[in-house]
Design a protein with these regions (language model features):
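Short beta-strand and adjoining strand-loop segment in the mid-core
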Residues: 141-155
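NAD(P)+-binding Rossmann beta1-loop-alpha1 motif at the extreme N-terminus of oxidoreductases
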Residues: 1-60, 68, 87
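Conserved SAM-binding loop
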Residues: 29, 58, 73-74, 150
Length: 155
C-alpha cells in the first residue's frame, strides 16, 4: 500500500514520518514549492517535530504525488479544501483512490463539514474518510499515548 500526504505542515509531515518510519509504508509527501514548510523539509528533511526518512519521496509536483498513491491523505487548511479538491477532481485520476481528510473544522462560508465539501466537488462519498483525534504531534513524537480514529460512510 502506498500513501501520498498532500500538505507538508505539522500534521502532514508527522503523518508521513509515522507511516514510513513507524509502519514501513511507501510514502510521498507533497508541498507547494512556495511553502516555507516545504522549503525547510526540502533543504533539511526535518522540522521542529520530525526528521523525514530518506525513503519518503518529497515533491512539489501534485501529479507525481497523486499518481504515486493508493491512498491520499489531505492535510491542508480547511478553508482551502474546496478549491484544492476542485483542482484534484478536474485534473487528476482519483477514481480508484481512497481519500483521507486529516484536518479539522468546517468550511466557514457554508458551515459544511469537510466531507460534504469533497462530495459536492465530485469525490465519491464511499472513497472519503476522516482521521481525527484529540492528538498533539509533540505527544506522538515523544511516545505519549493518544487517541485518534478514522471513520467513513463506507463501513
Amino acid at each position: 500500500m502506498k500513501f501520498s500526504v498532500l500538505g507538508c505542515g505539522r500534521w502532514g509531515s508527522f503523518i508521513s514520518w509515522y507511516l514510513c518510519s513507524k509502519k514501513g509504508y511507501d510514502v510521498c509527501l507533497y508541498g507547494r514549492e512556495s511553502s516555507k514548510a516545504f522549503q525547510l523539509l526540502k533543504n533539511t528533511r526535518k522540522n521542529e517535530y520530525v526528521s523525514l526518512d530518506e525513503k519518503i519521496l518529497l515533491t512539489s509536483e501534485l501529479e507525481k504525488a497523486v499518481d504515486f498513491a493508493d491512498i491520499i491523505i489531505i492535510s491542508i487548511s480547511a478553508q482551502n479544501l474546496r478549491e484544492f479538491v476542485r483542482d484534484l477532481v478536474a485534473n487528476y485520476h482519483l477514481k480508484d483512490k481512497k481519500i483521507i481528510l486529516c484536518m479539522k473544522g468546517l468550511e466557514t462560508p457554508s458551515g459544511k463539514r469537510l466531507t460534504q465539501v469533497c462530495i459536492e466537488e465530485g469525490i465519491d462519498k464511499n472513497n472519503i474518510a476522516v482521521w481525527l483525534g484529540p492528538g498533539h504531534i509533540q505527544d506522538f513524537t515523544n511516545g505519549i499515548p493518544n487517541c485518534m480514529t478514522i471513520d467513513s460512510y463506507n463501513k
